């Protein structure tokens, strides 16, 4: 999108089941991991999509293992909730070749479980967290679960 409001509007008007835009990493590592991209612009894209279509399911993903600190990762998750991102995927960085960035840390299954619990506690409607999780991981089920939760919330509001 590179900040193009027209491009985002075209996608939103196509009424996708989910709008996915991965932030990929924490702000401190953004230039190294995503050259040419900007963390704030990625967050703004998700926020603008939400304003254009409040019912649109939004999703983002973070790959871990680039050298981020735990607190930086939690802040990135909080930043995504601040723009009302619905679904979060968290997966391990796996270096495709020696020409790519090295792996700085392998996260344990327990750490991925803790991140999932923290994300759910922050209010994400669905969190996938594990070493092999990618943004497409169980995508249809994620969309259906978020839709059910939203519909349930509307039903509860109507009963009040």
Task: For every predicted segment, state its role.
Residues 1-11, 25, 64-72:
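Canonical radical SAM enzyme core domain
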Residues 13-14, 37-57, 62-160:
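Auxiliary Fe-S-binding modules of radical SAM enzymes
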Residues 26-27, 134:
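Alpha-helix N-cap/helix-start and coil->helix boundary motif
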Residues 4, 29, 33-43:
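Active-site-adjacent beta->alpha loops and helix N-cap segments on the catalytic face
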Residues 24-26, 93:
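Short, acidic/turn-prone active-site loops that include or flank metal/cofactor-
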């Amino acid at each position: 999108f590179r900040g193009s409001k027209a491009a985002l509007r075209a996608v939103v008007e196509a009424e996708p089941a989910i709008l996915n835009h991965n932030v990929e990493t924490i702000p401190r590592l953004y230039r190294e991991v995503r050259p040419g991209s900007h963390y704030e612009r990625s967050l703004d894209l998700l926020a603008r999509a939400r304003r254009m279509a409040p019912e649109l399911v939004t999703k983002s993903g973070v790959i871990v293992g680039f050298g981020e600190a735990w607190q930086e990762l939690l802040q990135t998750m909080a930043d995504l909730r601040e723009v009302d991102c619905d679904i979060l995927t968290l997966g391990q960085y796996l270096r495709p070749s020696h020409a790519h960035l090295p792996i700085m840390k392998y996260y344990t299954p327990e750490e991925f479980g803790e991140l999932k619990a923290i994300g759910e506690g922050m209010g994400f409607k669905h969190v996938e967290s594990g070493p092999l999780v990618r943004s497409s991981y169980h995508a249809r089920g994620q969309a259906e679960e978020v839709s059910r939760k939203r519909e349930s919330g509307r039903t509860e509001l109507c009963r009040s």
